[in-house]
From Swiss-Prot:
SUPFAM superfamilies: C-terminal domain of transcriptional repressors (SSF50037), Class II aaRS and biotin synthetases (SSF55681), Winged helix' DNA-binding domain (SSF46785)
DNA-binding region range list: 22-41
Protein name, entry field: Bifunctional ligase/repressor BirA
Lineage per the UniProt record: Bacteria, Pseudomonadati, Pseudomonadota, Gammaproteobacteria, Enterobacterales
Reaction equations catalysed: biotin + L-lysyl-[protein] + ATP = N(6)-biotinyl-L-lysyl-[protein] + AMP + diphosphate + H(+)
């Protein structure tokens, strides 16, 4: 990965939303205006909108709040949280270090160069706009005990966001958060471990907070940001609250499985009792969503018969 020191220093100087001349920035960083312009282009490549106004210099459309390790740690009583300005993927960062991690260790990033979603899809991750968070957990009972884990993560994230004012956030089976029927956040659970061994789990989450411009071919479904819904949250506070609540939820999940979460899912289910379609490969199955069963499988009603559906290749969409 190329050195990102200069662009990161630039973004910290521009974060106040004021104009800064190329000359001033060059003096601060000990380089020419032409060199500054080159690094500004790197910021644009990261998805940052930088305005250039002749005679005034460079500015961001509005101030941005950068992630701060000290502020996050000050709200937690234990565990490690790495703050990574630029990374390929937060999940990959933890997967690469799995031998040195303790349950509950986490990382957050400003920008993911290769963020990924379910089924290997690319996850669009512009700099400083959203919250990208991953956490490690060792599940002693093994991989089979992880069934339903993405549902638990979704419930906890939705409950945290609702308490902070985003009270219309809901969950979508098996791994998304929805707001006003559009995707607000995605969850990716990756695990390694053989039957009989402990499961090494990395949980990743991306929450759309204030996404700026986006190419339509990058995101293949309707999406929304908290900002668009009129909700502004402190990213450092949100990261700390999510990490705290997820650690507690994973301990409970280890002891009691999915059962403490079933009624909580029902209250938050975006598609309960609504017409939906399941996409399995190139096949579409239509029915009425009736929630989840005790294993976390989706319950789909067709012609008065309710059947559970489970599997990594199933997508759920509204059929309304």
């Amino acid at each position: 990965m190329k050195d990102t020191t200069v662009p990161l220093t630039l973004i910290s100087l521009l974060a106040d939303g004021e104009f800064h001349s190329g000359e001033q920035l060059g003096e601060r960083l000990g380089m020419s205006r032409a060199a500054i312009n080159k690094h500004i282009q790197t910021l644009r490549d990261w998805g940052v909108d930088v305005f250039t106004v002749p005679g005034k210099g460079y500015s961001l459309p509005e101030p941005i709040q950068l992630l701060d390790a000290d502020r996050i740690h000050s709200q937690l009583d234990s565990g490690n949280v790495a703050v990574l300005p630029v990374i390929d993927s937060t999940n990959q960062y933890l997967l690469d270090r799995i031998g040195e991690l303790r349950s509950g260790d986490a990382c957050v990033a400003e920008y993911q160069q290769a963020g990924r979603g379910r089924r290997g899809r690319k996850w669009f991750s512009p700099f400083g706009a959203n919250l990208y968070l991953s956490m490690y957990w060792r599940l002693e009972q093994g991989p089979a005990a992880a069934i339903g884990l993405s549902l638990v993560i979704g419930i906890v994230m939705a409950e945290v966001l609702r308490k902070l004012g985003a009270d219309k956030v809901r969950v979508k089976w098996p791994n998304d958060l929805y707001l006003l029927d559009r995707k607000l956040a995605g969850i990716l659970v990756e695990l390694t471990g053989k039957t009989g061994d402990a499961a090494q789990i990395v949980i990743g989450a991306g929450i759309n907070m204030a996404m700026r411009r986006v190419e339509e071919d990058v995101i293949n479904q309707g999406w929304i940001t908290l900002q668009e819904a009129g909700i502004t949250l402190d990213r450092n506070m949100l990261a700390a609250k999510l990490i705290y609540k997820l650690r507690a939820a994973l301990e409970l999940f280890e002891q009691e499985g999915l059962s403490p979460y079933l009624s909580r899912w029902k209250k938050l289910d975006n598609f309960i009792d609504r017409p939906v379609k399941l996409i399995i490969g190139d096949k579409e199955i239509f029915g009425i969503s009736r929630g989840i069963d005790t294993q976390g499988a989706l319950l789909l009603e067709q012609d008065g018969v309710i059947k559970p559906w489970m599997g990594g290749e199933i997508s759920l969409r509204s059929a309304e």
